Amino acid sequence: MSTAERPTVFITDYAWPDVEIERAVIEGAGFKLVAGPSTPAPAAEIEALVEQHQPAGILTNWAPVTAKAIGSSPALRIVGRLGVGLDNIAVDEATRRGIWVTNVPDYCFEEVADHSVGMLLAFTRGLVHFDREVRAGRWEPATARLLRLKTLTCGIVGYGRIGRSTAQKLNGFGARVLAYTRSSGAAEKGVEFVGLEQLLRESDAVIVHIPLNAETKHLLNRERLAWMKRGAFLINVSRGAVIDTQALIEALQSGRLGGAALDVLENEPTVPPALLAQPNVILTPHIAFTSDASLRELRQWASEEVVRVLRGQPPKEGRNKPAGIAAR
């Protein structure tokens, strides 16, 4: 089969230096890989690139894969997410058109859990604060209140693989752990399943792991942030829009919250100036999921899903039920 005849896989964007792992898997299976810009392009540009390349498979990291993009390639059979969340993919349109949508749910739960606990320790041990102080020429140990993690109540909002891993790590520190999940939580040693209001009212630190969808957008709004203990810490490593940013800014400015650590924002990569102005805010650029090991697994497994579908097999991690798929 000539290069021109091989089915094409289009990778919309990627948060790493190259696409060699993806290329090895895709082209090693006899398909053609075409890469878009590494930085996520606007929806219109992605739609034009899909129209141009007519891919049978799409791999996407952060770029929007809209209904128009999905409808622009009659050959399309799979949209594979290089990640867990599906909020940048028009899943309903893919389903309607008989196209698989996949993700990689297992690859980074340890890293995200590590990141969330690391952010909590940055507050309880004053790591970021004292680093800034020493670099500014100030050696003043009494400028921040430090806390013993074992004495704290930590609430986890969202209790999937990442939430469970976070709970296990917090148990290791001896903290009391509360968890809120929209599904019924089975009894689990070291974890108390409670309602969201109770969790917010009792927790000294709240860690957010819940996925973003229509029901969870602004789940932590002005009313619910007001339920939190005065001086509590809020850590978000899920999706920025789970928290109402303006309400969060107000809670920080008023002193109701003791601090916020955010790996995600509502409109990445734009950072609201009011967040930058708060000394008790820690920001990282959506990298909680990354490590050498997790990125290798992500890229390999996502690419293998595309190959599986293009070979006529069902994916291992399908996240929809494509219309008419049984007839193919």
Where are these regions (language model features)?
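An N-terminal-biased, well-structured beta-alpha scaffold segment characteristic
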Residues: S2-W100, R201, N221-E223
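Active-site regions of enzymes building and remodeling cell-envelope glycoconjugates
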Residues: G28-L33, I99, E188-L196, N280-V281
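Phosphate-binding beta-alpha-beta segment of Rossmann-like dinucleotide-binding domains, i.e.
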Residues: R97-I99, P105-T153, S165-Q168, G172, ...
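Rossmann-like dinucleotide-binding domain for NAD(H)/NADP(H)
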Residues: R97, V101, G231-R328
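Glycine-rich Rossmann-fold phosphate-binding loop(s) that bind the pyrophosphate
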Residues: Y14, Y159-G160
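Short, Asp-centered acidic motifs that coordinate Mg2+ and/or phosphate
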Residues: A56-G57, I78, A205, F233, ...
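Rossmann-like adenosine-cofactor binding region
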Residues: E51, T66-I70, R176, R182-A274
